[in-house]
């Protein structure tokens, strides 16, 4: 039976008031225009508050606005009422109780509310055999908190009844988003339901596979009809092979094959030769069991790697997660975990580290009232609001309370159970920060380092006034390139947010052990014997730091002194030191087969780090600078005709490509220019533009484009005229110089063609003999300076320079063979002790594996 108790007390107010039957219709009349029935495109948030992690399971329940369908906890619903004037909310409450035990001790079947069933997608485990729940819904009218119990068909207007039913039966907005997160959804094979499988006694071993017709041990496919193991071919697998699986299909006609090494409890890569495309096999577990493969106990070995590669890393998982030790759970402010949404541990680890930094705490949680009060009408789509919500959830301690013995006894006596919070769910945060990114918006595992840069980019773009907490990571890198032939040098600076440290494998201190282990491992694999105990390479941190500072060769370096390509050498130094230094260990690389591989190494990362010796010194006495001349770009004739068509409206720039480039560490404005000047042809093409132009002085300056007017008359410029007769507008000059031509070329070409961009380009291509006329250039520059008001010099990059001495306070570790798989956890030093954050589990760390980390966070030691 539905519980009809009074509404929990509102903030600073009394409990709810119940209405007499005759008053309900009259009370709702003034609010009817604001009550809506959810349409198909509306998102109904009835699982989680927009400002907090309150849910229907929370003590105060959840309030769903009957106009916007946003949800608010008890502490935040008044804010929404004051801001919007919306008065009618649906209050949802789920009561969880311990099940009544039968005479034999078994739990009785779960009871549900006979009138109300909320289709809630909460993260609490309410399907346990020990608990049952009862759902309650009512309409609440603000500001007097009048309550109308639901359902109430007899007394409510028809529109209100329809709206309430639609809200109660609506699906979670995150479920609606799920289909969009998967690209290229595969069709179900028409052969899967009635697939013939031969009873030939074939049993497939868990490892040691080999093509039945050649010696290949990778890219192997198991035919699901006869159990043949044969190699694939590049056109449907993209990793090479001799095509024996396809030949077998042509000979026998058996249509389906599964790629060995991709089988997991969640599925596998299945290909249909008959349908000529990857497909889904809904009966895959049954088809694999026919050949002795237990799909539920298989672990994927990505891209054809052997299962032994996974077994070798068992010790890595155990060490990083501190398995085998009894870890003490931590509760309270700063000790709240994040639930895993399915491959979301990369996000959880980064956010735990981010919100352990005081500058981020102050910028978001410290400004919580202001950010929440001035949030847009839909706070679920506001970055600063969702950052503040997440930060408060992690730091407040509100969702990390230890169980109290007296409360447990009282709950047992009342047969009621209040679920202990096992962390908060970052669903709303992840949905927003990943929606514009093709990778992070998927449900696949991602690289924590890439997400860190993605987050920094979002912080930069959504800065709160003059406050930008990501400034603590920003530093300047000085790159010195020397032409080996002329010995002349060029110094440039760029902005970066993390230090990428190479793994100096050649400096391993246990080389003899590694060689012996590798020989033993190969012999064991060949003879199918148990693998030897893992021997991990031990790399001195000093060797990695030395590898970072050593000069590197620059292939195809264009020397402006020679006006030709030459050998070059590049060295990198810190032009400034950040307040917080993030160090990424470059553990991941690609093998000869382009398969991602991970260096399984142990590096003695220091607790105290001094990199003052890496401070940049700039141009040294006796050094001669390379001339400031850009390399020419050769554009084929057929490209000239398309050049003008590639220029797009700046408002149509592909922001996803811009963000992908920005996450590589390039300035945001440079990324926008790269995407613009390559005609929205994708991040890869834009990246090539960046490589060519990154040394130009205006590389990071904002993209400024002239407006396009109506059709120009013959011989007239398509751009607006400048204040000086026939003086080329700076915007047009910038377009041409961004294509690699010299400034004086651009100016003379535009003057010769009356500032017509297309004709100016043709003029440049038809005058290859053009040489710089210094008198002409000087005269023109003087005229330009006399007639054009120069803008103020743009503010330089914001950096917080200081000493290069640091102490370690957090690190993120990765377990697995690739950034696209495995698991991430985070260790943070708080209150003088290390704490392990493993998704929703937060415990005191006994043996923090500082030598196995992937990303390290250092804070500056005040000098």
From Swiss-Prot:
<dbReference type="GO" id="GO:0008270">
    <property type="term" value="F:zinc ion binding"/>
</dbReference>
<dbReference type="GO" id="GO:0044389">
    <property type="term" value="F:ubiquitin-like protein ligase binding"/>
</dbReference>
<dbReference type="GO" id="GO:0004197">
    <property type="term" value="F:cysteine-type endopeptidase activity"/>
</dbReference>
<dbReference type="GO" id="GO:0004843">
    <property type="term" value="F:cysteine-type deubiquitinase activity"/>
</dbReference>
<comment type="similarity">
    <text>Belongs to the peptidase C19 family.</text>
</comment>
<dbReference type="InterPro" id="IPR050185">
    <property type="entry name" value="Ub_carboxyl-term_hydrolase"/>
</dbReference>
<dbReference type="GO" id="GO:0030318">
    <property type="term" value="P:melanocyte differentiation"/>
</dbReference>
<keyword id="KW-0072">Autophagy</keyword>
<dbReference type="GO" id="GO:1904294">
    <property type="term" value="P:positive regulation of ERAD pathway"/>
</dbReference>
<dbReference type="InterPro" id="IPR013083">
    <property type="entry name" value="Znf_RING/FYVE/PHD"/>
</dbReference>
<keyword id="KW-0378">Hydrolase</keyword>
<dbReference type="InterPro" id="IPR001394">
    <property type="entry name" value="Peptidase_C19_UCH"/>
</dbReference>
<dbReference type="GO" id="GO:0070628">
    <property type="term" value="F:proteasome binding"/>
</dbReference>
<dbReference type="Pfam" id="PF22562">
    <property type="entry name" value="UBA_7"/>
</dbReference>
<dbReference type="InterPro" id="IPR001607">
    <property type="entry name" value="Znf_UBP"/>
</dbReference>
<feature type="domain" description="UBA 2">
    <location>
        <begin position="727"/>
        <end position="767"/>
    </location>
</feature>
<dbReference type="GO" id="GO:0005634">
    <property type="term" value="C:nucleus"/>
</dbReference>
<feature type="cross-link" description="Glycyl lysine isopeptide (Lys-Gly) (interchain with G-Cter in SUMO2)">
    <location>
        <position position="311"/>
    </location>
</feature>
<dbReference type="Pfam" id="PF00443">
    <property type="entry name" value="UCH"/>
</dbReference>
<keyword id="KW-0863">Zinc-finger</keyword>
<feature type="active site" description="Proton acceptor">
    <location>
        <position position="823"/>
    </location>
</feature>
<dbReference type="InterPro" id="IPR009060">
    <property type="entry name" value="UBA-like_sf"/>
</dbReference>
<feature type="binding site">
    <location>
        <position position="211"/>
    </location>
    <ligand>
        <name>Zn(2+)</name>
    </ligand>
</feature>
<keyword id="KW-0597">Phosphoprotein</keyword>
<keyword id="KW-0677">Repeat</keyword>
<dbReference type="GO" id="GO:0051087">
    <property type="term" value="F:protein-folding chaperone binding"/>
</dbReference>
<dbReference type="InterPro" id="IPR018200">
    <property type="entry name" value="USP_CS"/>
</dbReference>
<keyword id="KW-0788">Thiol protease</keyword>
<protein>
    <recommendedName>
        <fullName>Ubiquitin carboxyl-terminal hydrolase 13</fullName>
        <ecNumber>3.4.19.12</ecNumber>
    </recommendedName>
</protein>
<dbReference type="GO" id="GO:0035523">
    <property type="term" value="P:protein K29-linked deubiquitination"/>
</dbReference>
<dbReference type="GO" id="GO:0036506">
    <property type="term" value="P:maintenance of unfolded protein"/>
</dbReference>
<dbReference type="GO" id="GO:0070536">
    <property type="term" value="P:protein K63-linked deubiquitination"/>
</dbReference>
<keyword id="KW-1017">Isopeptide bond</keyword>
<dbReference type="InterPro" id="IPR038765">
    <property type="entry name" value="Papain-like_cys_pep_sf"/>
</dbReference>
<keyword id="KW-0832">Ubl conjugation</keyword>
<dbReference type="GO" id="GO:1904288">
    <property type="term" value="F:BAT3 complex binding"/>
</dbReference>
<dbReference type="Pfam" id="PF17807">
    <property type="entry name" value="zf-UBP_var"/>
</dbReference>
<feature type="binding site">
    <location>
        <position position="231"/>
    </location>
    <ligand>
        <name>Zn(2+)</name>
    </ligand>
</feature>
<dbReference type="GO" id="GO:0050821">
    <property type="term" value="P:protein stabilization"/>
</dbReference>
<feature type="active site" description="Nucleophile">
    <location>
        <position position="345"/>
    </location>
</feature>
<keyword id="KW-0862">Zinc</keyword>
<dbReference type="InterPro" id="IPR041432">
    <property type="entry name" value="UBP13_Znf-UBP_var"/>
</dbReference>
């Amino acid at each position: 039976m539905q519980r009809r108790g009074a509404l929990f007390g509102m903030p600073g107010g009394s409990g709810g008031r119940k209405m007499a039957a005759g008053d309900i219709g009259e009370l709702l009349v003034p609010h009817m225009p604001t009550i809506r029935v959810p349409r198909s495109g509306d998102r109904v948030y009835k699982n989680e508050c927009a400002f907090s992690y309150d849910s229907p399971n929370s003590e105060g329940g959840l309030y769903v606005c009957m106009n916007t369908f946003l949800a608010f906890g008890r502490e935040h619903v008044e804010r929404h009422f004051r801001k919007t004037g919306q008065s009618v909310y649906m209050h949802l409450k789920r009561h969880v109780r311990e099940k009544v035990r039968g005479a034999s001790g078994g739990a009785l079947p779960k009871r549900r509310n006979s009138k109300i069933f909320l289709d809630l997608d909460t993260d609490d485990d309410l399907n346990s055999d020990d608990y049952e729940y009862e759902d309650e819904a009512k309409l609440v009218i603000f500001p007097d908190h009048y309550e109308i119990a639901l359902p109430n068909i007899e007394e409510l207007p028809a529109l209100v009844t329809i709206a309430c039913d639609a809200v109660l039966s609506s699906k979670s907005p995150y479920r609606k988003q799920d289909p969009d997160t998967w690209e290229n959804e595969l069709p179900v094979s028409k052969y899967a339901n009635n697939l013939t499988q031969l009873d030939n006694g074939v049993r497939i071993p868990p490892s040691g596979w080999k093509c039945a017709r050649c010696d290949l041990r990778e890219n192997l496919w198991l035919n699901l009809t006869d159990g043949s193991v044969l190699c694939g071919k590049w056109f449907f697998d993209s990793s090479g092979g001799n095509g024996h699986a396809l030949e077998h299909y042509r000979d026998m006609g058996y249509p389906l094959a599964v790629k060995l090494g991709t089988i997991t409890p969640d599925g596998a890569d299945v290909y249909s030769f008959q349908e000529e495309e990857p497909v889904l096999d809904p009966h895959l577990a049954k088809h694999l069991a026919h050949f002795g493969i237990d799909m539920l106990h298989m672990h994927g070995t990505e891209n054809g790697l052997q299962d032994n590669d996974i077994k070798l890393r068992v010790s890595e998982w155990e060490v990083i997660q501190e398995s085998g030790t009894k870890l003490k759970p931590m509760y309270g402010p700063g000790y709240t975990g994040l639930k895993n949404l399915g491959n979301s541990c990369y996000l959880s680890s980064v956010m735990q580290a981010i919100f352990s930094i005081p500058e981020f705490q102050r910028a978001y949680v410290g400004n919580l009232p202001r950010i929440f009060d001035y949030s847009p009408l839909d706070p679920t789509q506001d970055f600063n609001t969702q950052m503040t919500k997440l930060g408060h959830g992690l730091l407040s301690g509100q969702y990390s309370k230890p169980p109290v013995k007296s409360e447990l006894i009282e709950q047992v006596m009342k047969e009621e159970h209040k679920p202990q919070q096992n962390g908060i769910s970052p669903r709303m945060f992840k949905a927003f920060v990943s929606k514009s990114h093709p990778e992070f918006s998927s449900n696949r595992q991602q690289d924590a380092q890439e997400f860190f840069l993605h987050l920094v980019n979002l912080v930069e773009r959504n800065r709160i006034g003059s406050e930008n907490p990501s400034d603590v990571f920003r530093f300047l890198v000085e790159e010195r390139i020397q032409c080996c032939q002329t010995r002349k040098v060029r110094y440039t600076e760029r902005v970066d947010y993390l230090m990428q440290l190479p793994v100096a494998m050649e400096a391993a201190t246990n080389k003899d052990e590694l060689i012996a282990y590798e020989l033993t491992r190969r012999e064991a694999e060949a003879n199918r014997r148990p693998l030897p105990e893992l021997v991990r390479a031990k790399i001195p941190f000093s060797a990695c730091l030395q590898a970072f500072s050593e000069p590197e060769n620059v292939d195809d370096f264009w020397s402006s002194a020679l006006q030709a390509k030459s050998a070059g050498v590049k060295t990198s130094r810190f032009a400034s030191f950040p307040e917080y230094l993030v160090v990424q260990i470059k553990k991941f690389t690609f093998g000869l087969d382009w398969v991602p591989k991970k260096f399984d190494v142990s590096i003695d990362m220091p607790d105290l780090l001094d990199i003052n010796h890496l401070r940049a010194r700039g141009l040294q006495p006796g050094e001669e600078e390379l001339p400031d001349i850009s390399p020419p770009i050769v554009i084929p004739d057929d490209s000239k005709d398309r050049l003008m068509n590639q220029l797009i409206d700046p408002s149509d720039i592909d922001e996803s490509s811009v963000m992908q480039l920005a996450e590589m560490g390039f300035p945001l404005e440079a990324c926008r220019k790269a995407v613009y000047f390559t005609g929205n042809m994708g991040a890869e093409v834009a990246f090539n533009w960046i490589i060519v132009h990154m040394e130009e002085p205006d590389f990071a300056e904002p993209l400024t484009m002239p407006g396009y007017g109506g059709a120009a008359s013959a011989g007239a410029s398509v751009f607006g005229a400048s204040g000086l007769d026939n003086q080329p507008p700076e915007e047009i000059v910038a377009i041409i110089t961004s294509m690699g031509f010299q400034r004086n070329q651009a100016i003379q070409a535009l003057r010769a063609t009356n500032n017509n961009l297309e004709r100016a380009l043709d003029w440049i291509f038809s005058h290859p003999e053009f040489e710089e006329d210094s008198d002409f250039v000087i005269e023109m520059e003087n005229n330009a300076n006399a007639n054009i008001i120069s803008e103020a010099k743009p503010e330089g990059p914001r950096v917080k320079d200081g000493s290069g001495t640091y102490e370690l306070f957090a690190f993120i570790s990765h377990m697995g063979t690739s950034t696209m798989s495995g698991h991430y956890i985070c260790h943070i030093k708080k209150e003088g002790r290390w704490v392990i954050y493993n998704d929703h589990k937060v415990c005191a760390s006994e043996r923090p594996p500082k030598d196995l980390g992937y990303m390290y966070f250092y804070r500056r030691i005040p000098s």
